[in-house]
Each structure stands twice: as structure tokens, then as C-alpha cells.
Amino acid sequence: MNGSVLPSRGRVTINQVAEAAGVSKASVSRYIGGDRQLLADATARRIERAIDQLDYRPNQMARGLKRGRTRLIGMLVADILNPYSVAVMHGVETACREHGYSLVVCNTDRDDEQERHHLAALQSYNVEGLIVNTLGHHPGELRALHRELPMVLVDRQLAELDTDLVGLDNADAVEQALDHLQHRGFRDILLVTEPLDGTSSRIERVQAFNASIGRRPALKGQVLQTDDFFRDGLRAFLSASGPGPKALFTCNGVATLCATRQLRDLGCRLFDEVGLLALDELDWYPLVGSGITALAQPTDEIGRTAFERLLARLEGDREPARRVTFPAQLIVRGSTHPRG
């Protein structure tokens, strides 16, 4: 082996490995491409020594592109600061790693132009499939991309896309919440949600809430969005007379944080004057007062399942689009202690 070929800096190339081993570039390509059985044992040993000496790392992206495979999965999220998105992303990334894929995450920060930019970027990265948890304000671009590669939606249905969806069973979660609150003696329920903004999961929860309240004559219910009028609406709810003890049902972690801050600022004693049940389970819920009762979403399983559906499509599954939903798990804490 010619041991004099040692690059002083920069990325080691396949040509340098071939020169150091005294073999052709094609032989090195066969070696790193898994076709070592085509090489003489002595040739393979020289290539191995050269790779070790030069600390050569094959460019996996380039190798993948030559074979039509990058083993990259794209994930588009609306808000990377949202704990739900982070938790689902963890499940997706874990499943990707277990199957030999890498995850490329793009955060739109709820910005329409960023969403458009990231869709173009992900396409340029040659991702093999895409997982989408975003506002979907560019259905044309999403449809065009879906014609080229498989796509799975998380949490939010986009009417323009006929593709798999993985998320929570929203109707069941609302039923669990109202069953628990009613059993604990609450009668006046305020559902708190982020602005609907066409987001299917938020709309489904509001619709399920209104329908369930309509079937429960003992309960009174109303809906309040966390917009500029939220503080005034919350104050009005707390001060109004009603059929009995009051409770808030917050539809996600962001709404829960907003509601607890406003309750504190309004001087409301948590959780003596009003009960609270939150959808999503966040690390800080047990730390507030006597703890916030929660409906935990199986975020890790949702993320894993989203990747598994995408993998099935990559492997040739051509069945009609499926909706895979999971039930929430009720975790009871002091915020919904029984009322007389």
C-alpha cells in the first residue's frame, strides 16, 4: 500500500482511498457498497487498511442518490415550541432510527411563507416521504408533493389531501372529559381552545363538546378561544351565575398555560373556585397547586405509527387512505377534586 497519500485537511475522498490502497475507484466503490465478495481478499484488506488510516467516511447522501434512495424522511411542523409537536417528533425520530432512516425537521413557526419555503426545501433534499403536522395553508403545493412521494398527516386533517392520518380520537377524549367532570360534580363547563383557524383537530373537539353537552341536560357548556378577548370572556364566565360548580376544559397545552395564567391574574384560587381538566399531559401539570387533571395523548405511539404508515406506503401499500386514532388516558389530580 502506498502510505504516503495522507490528506492534510478537508474531507477524504474515494479517490484518495483508492490511491492509498493502490486500487481503482471502482474497487473502493464495490467495497463500501457491500459487494466485497466481488473483490480478491488481498484487495479488500488493502482497501480496509486505507479506510482506517485515512478515517474515511462515505458520503451516504451521494451513495443514496446514485441508488435512488436517500433514507431521509421529512417532517413539517407548525410550531416546534409546542410540547405536543416535540413529543410526536421524538416518536417519529425513534422509529426512523430503528429502521435506518434519518429525520429532517422543518418548523414553519405558523408562518405561511415559511411553510411554502420548507416544502420546496424538503423536495430539494430528496426526502423519501413526508410527515405533516402543520396548518396546511398551501394545499396546492402539498398535493403536488404528494403526487411525487408518500405523505402522512399527524393530528390535523387536510381536506385537499387523500392520505393517511394519525392522531387522537377527539370525540372519545371529549366524552372522557365531560364524564369525569360531571361525575365530580361540575355543572358549568367552559371549553378553552386556541383559535380554530381551520385546524381540524380543534374543530372536532369543539363540535364533539357541543354535541355532548346537548346530550347532558344537567350540564351547561360554552366555548372560548384564546384570542384578544379571552381575558374578558373568562372573567365573564367566572362571575356569571350558573347551574353549579364551574370547570375549564382546555383543549391542549398552549390553551392550558394561557388559562392558568389568566386565572392567576384574575385572582382565582386554583383550584378551589374553578376546576380544570387539560387535554395533553405536560411535565408542569403535577406542579401547579394540587396538580392538573389531564387527558394524556400517546404522543410517542402517534409518532411511531405515523412513520410506520409512511414506511408501509414506501414499501408499496396502495390501500385506501386510513385514519388511525388513539384514545386519551385520564390522569386524575387535585384540579378536579369532587364538588358537593
Curated annotation (Swiss-Prot):
Induction comment from the UniProt entry of this chain: Expression is enhanced by the global regulator MvaT, which binds to the ptxR-ptxS intergenic region. Negatively autoregulates its own synthesis by binding to a specific operator site within the ptxS upstream region.
Record-annotated membrane-spanning stretches: none
Q: Where does this protein have coiled-coil stretches?
A: none
Extract one GO cellular component term from the record: protein-DNA complex
Entry GO MF terms: DNA-binding transcription factor activity; DNA-binding transcription repressor activity; transcription cis-regulatory region binding
Describe the outcome of a gene knockout.
Mutant exhibits a twofold increase in exotoxin A production.
At the top level of its lineage, which domain of life is listed? Bacteria
By its UniProt entry, which PROSITE patterns does this protein fall under? HTH_LACI_2
Which residues form the DNA-binding region? 14-33
In the record, biological process GO terms are: negative regulation of DNA-templated transcription; regulation of DNA-templated transcription
Q: Which key words tag this protein in UniProt?
A: DNA-binding, Repressor, Transcription, Transcription regulation
- Could you tell me which residue ranges the HTH lacI-type domain spans? 12-67
| Activity regulation, per record | 2-ketogluconate acts as a molecular effector and causes dissociation of the PtxS/PtxR complex.
Self-association and partners: Interacts with PtxR in the absence of 2-ketogluconate. Binding of the 2-ketogluconate effector to PtxS causes PtxS/PtxR complex dissociation.
- Recorded domain comment: Contains an N-terminal helix-turn-helix DNA-binding domain and a C-terminal domain that binds the effector.
Functionally, this protein is described as follows: Negatively regulates glucose metabolism by binding directly to the promoter region of the kgu and gad operons. It also negatively regulates its own synthesis. In addition, in pathogenic strains, PtxS modulates PtxR activity in response to 2-ketogluconate. In the presence of PtxR, which also binds to the kgu and gad promoter regions, PtxS and PtxR form a tight complex, creating a DNA-loop that prevents RNA polymerase promoter access and expression of the glucose metabolism genes. Binding of the 2-ketogluconate effector to PtxS causes PtxS/PtxR complex dissociation and leads to the dissolution of the repression DNA-loop, facilitating the entry of the RNA polymerase and enabling the transcription of the genes.
Protein name (database record): HTH-type transcriptional regulator PtxS
Q: Which organism is it from?
A: Pseudomonas aeruginosa (strain ATCC 15692 / DSM 22644 / CIP 104116 / JCM 14847 / LMG 12228 / 1C / PRS 101 / PAO1)
Tell me the name of the encoding gene. ptxS
